[in-house]
Amino acid sequence: MAVIKCKPTSPGRRHVVKVVNTDLHKGKPFAGLLAKKTKSGGRNNTGRITVRHVGGGHKQHYRIVDFKRNKDGIPAKVERLEYDPNRTAHIALVLYADGERRYILAAKGMKAGDPIQSGLDAEIKTGNARPLRNIPVGSVVHAVEMKPGKGAQIARSAGAYVQVVARDGAYATLRLRSGEMRKVPVDCRATFGEVGNAEHMLRQLGKAGAKRWRGVRPTVRGVAMNPVDHPHGGGEGRTSGGRHPVSPWGVPTKGYKTRSNKRTDKYIVRRRNK
């Protein structure tokens, strides 16, 4: 993995910082694990914008990634690592002994030819998956389920990981990167190690167009809008907005707590660090 700062041969190249991984597959992805991906432009079925700053971008296929890791007892081998445009992490194409291929998240240090396995008897080794009840306390894991059999939801992005800090009865306690301590059922699965491509955070796109290639549209400041569009809009000349910062719908944006899910409050042992 190399971090390359581009020479300023043009204004668009001046600030570009690339992260280059020579171990990634240079050919096409495995066709049997691709799905069609239709762009919405941030609109719902009525045609109204429900997600701002979304639209355009290069056409992409979705890679079907195995987040459940439920193929127990069958050894597999990593065939190759691939780039995935749909996520910050890289993915690994694995070939099982019975001939099936699946994509999984590429863990830190994973390379082509590595053996992996999932199940109760899987070795304690990066890339192997086990239920939390069979993972030693203190282990660093990623791709953690929140409900048994649902598929991984926690620690899936580049460089992410959580630590198993305790196990009591039907629940294991995890320490998340944010500092939050959360309980998860011990029958949920997790994968040993960290997610790879941690250098992703060092990347700099360098120009607005690179964001547009990724389907991200510009963000307009509220004070630059009209009063009909935003609470900060309007006024003669430049203004400060005239009030504490709020969203277009009037919700305070600076540190205001918006979490309201009492059903799952009991699973949070400690809120995240501020």
Curated annotation (Swiss-Prot):
GO biological process: cytoplasmic translation
A Pfam family that the UniProt record links to this protein: Ribosomal_L2
Keywords attached to this entry: Ribonucleoprotein, Ribosomal protein, RNA-binding, rRNA-binding
PROSITE patterns (UniProt xref): RIBOSOMAL_L2
SMART domains documented for this protein: Ribosomal_L2 (SM01383), Ribosomal_L2_C (SM01382)
Residue segments, region Disordered: 223-274
Disulfide pattern: none
One Gene Ontology CC term in the entry: large ribosomal subunit
rRNA-binding as UniProt keyword: yes
Cross-referenced InterPro entries: NA-bd_OB-fold, Rib_uL2_dom2, Ribosomal_uL2, Ribosomal_uL2_bac/org-type, Ribosomal_uL2_C, Ribosomal_uL2_CS, Ribosomal_uL2_dom3, Ribosomal_uL2_RNA-bd_dom
RNA-binding is among the record's keywords: yes
GO molecular function annotations of the record: rRNA binding; structural constituent of ribosome; transferase activity
SUPFAM superfamilies documented for this protein: Nucleic acid-binding proteins, Translation proteins SH3-like domain
Family, as annotated: Belongs to the universal ribosomal protein uL2 family.
Protein task: One of the primary rRNA binding proteins. Required for association of the 30S and 50S subunits to form the 70S ribosome, for tRNA binding and peptide bond formation. It has been suggested to have peptidyltransferase activity; this is somewhat controversial. Makes several contacts with the 16S rRNA in the 70S ribosome.
Record's subunit section: Part of the 50S ribosomal subunit. Forms a bridge to the 30S subunit in the 70S ribosome.
HAMAP family per record: Ribosomal_uL2_B (MF_01320_B)
Name of this chain's protein: Large ribosomal subunit protein uL2
Organism, scientific name: Shewanella frigidimarina (strain NCIMB 400)
